[in-house]
């Protein structure tokens, strides 16, 4: 049994993430960028104008759908999470400052991957028995590639449903509970017995909240995400900017460190001199992937519910999503850490302590501890919301609506388990299945890349183009 577990958490995890996901992400990003004429660069202004530029306009959705904004905030709910804070901190600690450069580079390329996922999701979506729009990799396989490719969609759903319990549930709940404990300990340290009881109470409360929202369907999830995601993101951005400009003299040198060590990490000297170029590249690329989820196909499930007639129009939200998640929030986390001048033990894994120490340079230790704890808590909560939808849709595709209701009940129960149990092995296995999701998704993306290119050409480049 131990050998099987080691295979899933070690060998298979390495193969899935390092030897399949990362190469496919870079090659796929380059390929789709070329096929679609680099619209993430040439049409970036148009994309921002027609996504973030419309956020404050009143939008209403038709039956069985959500507004385009609710769709993207639901996707961002699952995407903007602990990876933006802890993941970016780890990229710097394990890959050096130069890892931030590779994080940026990957984000620019994977914008076209997420654009393609969302575009295909709208193009090949369908109505379910309730009349709701459903889509995602399993549907663009089914309706775009045909019955002989059904196994690809089934594989995706199996991998995603399993991953939803770990990456999208237990690990996030554990992060919330840990954050709440940190916030409480900043004022009144709790005894071990009291902590266990508190964790159980927290777990039940979180499960109840998730249940109320989840059983309200996609419209309720979208309504909550639409309000929560912008608020938590803006607050985090504001406090990060306060720290960065509070150390304004370090902004230039911070960028200097990032670019100077992107190709020669040993240039920093000292503890960072032990970091190899491979580590810098791999950790930058890997944390970028963990942060924005481009290539996993998960966000396409949320976007499929958007009330829109244009696949490309919704696809532009995919570009915005990566920009907001990685280029904006991850960059601010990185600059907050580097500009603050906090000590970094290179080559060692870190949690939230780096960003907490950075905030403490401006706001003091107690406030920083509470703020980071609350930020992690909100980010983790919205991640659970997004993944509850993803897992539910995958189970629905495999077994039907009735069984998806059973999945939802099980998902809520697992929330409580994640709050009180230490299940590192389960999380590691789920992380492997998270990476495996990319394999069937990339098969479909490459096979249907011509469809995306055709839709993009019709929208942007034909004489009677749809883009105004």
Question: Would you name each region that the model predicts?
Answer:
Residues 1-82, 92-99, 110, 416, ...:
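N-terminal alpha-helical transmembrane segments of multi-pass membrane transport
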Residues 32-33, 106-131, 138, 142-174, ...:
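Helix-loop-helix module between adjacent transmembrane segments
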Residues 115-125, 129, 239-257, 265-272, ...:
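Extracellular/periplasmic helix-exit of transmembrane alpha-helices
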């Amino acid at each position: 049994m131990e050998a099987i577990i080691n295979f899933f958490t070690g060998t298979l995890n390495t193969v899935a993430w390092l030897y399949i996901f990362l190469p496919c992400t870079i090659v796929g990003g380059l390929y789709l960028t070329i096929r679609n004429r680099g619209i993430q660069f040439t049409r970036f202004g148009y994309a921002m104008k027609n996504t973030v530029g419309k956020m404050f306009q009143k939008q209403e959705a038709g039956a069985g759908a959500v507004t385009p904004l609710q769709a993207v905030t639901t996707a961002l709910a699952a995407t903007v999470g602990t990876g933006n804070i802890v993941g970016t901190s780890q990229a710097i600690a394990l890959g050096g400052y130069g890892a931030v450069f590779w994080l940026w580079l990957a984000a620019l390329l994977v914008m076209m991957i997420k654009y393609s996922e969302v575009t295909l999701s709208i193009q090949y979506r369908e109505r379910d028995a309730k009349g709701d729009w459903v889509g995602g990799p399993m549907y663009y396989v089914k309706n775009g590639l045909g019955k002989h490719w059904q196994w690809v969609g089934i594989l995706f759903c199996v991998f995603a449903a399993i991953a939803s319990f770990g990456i999208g549930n237990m690990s996030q709940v554990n992060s919330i509970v840990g954050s709440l404990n940190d916030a409480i300990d900043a004022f009144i340290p709790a005894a071990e017995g009291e902590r266990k009881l508190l964790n159980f109470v927290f777990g039940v409360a979180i499960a109840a909240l998730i249940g109320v929202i989840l059983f309200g369907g996609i419209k309720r999830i979208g309504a909550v995400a639409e309000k929560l995601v912008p608020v938590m993101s803006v607050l985090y951005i504001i406090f990060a900017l306060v720290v960065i400009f509070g150390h304004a003299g370090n902004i230039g040198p911070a960028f200097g460190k990032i670019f100077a060590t992107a190709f020669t990490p040993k240039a920093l000297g000292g503890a960072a001199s032990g970091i190899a170029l491979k580590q810098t590249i791999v950790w930058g690329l890997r944390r970028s992937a963990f942060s924005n989820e481009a290539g996993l196909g998960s966000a396409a499930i949320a976007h499929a519910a958007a009330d829109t007639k244009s696949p490309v129009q919704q696809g532009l939200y995919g570009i915005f999503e990566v920009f907001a998640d990685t280029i904006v929030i991850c960059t601010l986390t990185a600059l907050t850490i580097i500009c603050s001048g906090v000590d970094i033990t290179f080559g060692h894994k870190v949690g939230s302590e780096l960003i907490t120490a950075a905030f403490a340079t401006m706001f003091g230790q107690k406030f920083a501890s509470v703020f980071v704890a609350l930020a992690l808590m909100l980010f983790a909560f919205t991640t659970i919301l997004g993944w509850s939808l993803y897992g539910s849709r995958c189970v629905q595709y495999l077994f039907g609506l009735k069984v998806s209701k059973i999945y939802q009940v099980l998902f809520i129960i697992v929330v409580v388990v994640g709050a009180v149990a230490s299940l590192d092995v389960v999380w590691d296995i789920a992380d492997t299945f998270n990476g495996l999701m990319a394999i069937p998704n990339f098969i479909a993306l490459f096979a249907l890349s011509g469809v995306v290119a055709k839709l993009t050409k019709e929208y942007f480049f034909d004489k009677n183009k749809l883009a105004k």
